[in-house]
Amino acid sequence: QGRPSFCNLPAETGPCKASFRQYYYNSKSGGCQQFIYGGCRGNQNRFDTTQQCQGVCV
């Protein structure tokens, strides 16, 4: 598979309390899904749009 390894990481909200709508690649379903990002830390499996997510991970 040609997708980056970070695409297999789980969605990670992080410890901060903000509420940003972001998208992550769900390796179980094989598609991009929305999640709420807290604004800090987290991991690389986080995108501003579903199109960005699909472009990198699908």
From Swiss-Prot:
Cited InterPro entries: Kunitz_BPTI, Kunitz_BPTI_sf, Prtase_inh_Kunz-CS, TFPI/VKTCI-like
GO molecular function, a single term: serine-type endopeptidase inhibitor activity
Entry superkingdom: Eukaryota
Domain BPTI/Kunitz inhibitor per the UniProt entry, residue ranges: 7-57
Signal peptide bounds: none
Gene3D superfamilies cross-referenced by the UniProt entry: Pancreatic trypsin inhibitor Kunitz domain (4.10.410.10)
Disulfide bond annotation, renumbered to this chain: C7-C57, C16-C40, C32-C53
UniProt subcellular location: Secreted
Reactive bond, annotated site positions: K17, A18
GO terms for cellular component: extracellular space
Keyword field contains Ribosomal protein: no
Modified residues (Pyrrolidone carboxylic acid): Q1
Keywords assigned: Disulfide bond, Protease inhibitor, Pyrrolidone carboxylic acid, Secreted, Serine protease inhibitor
Function per UniProt: This is one of several isoinhibitors of broad specificity that are secreted into the mucus of the snail.
Annotated protein name in UniProt: Isoinhibitor K
Species per Swiss-Prot/TrEMBL record: Helix pomatia (Roman snail)
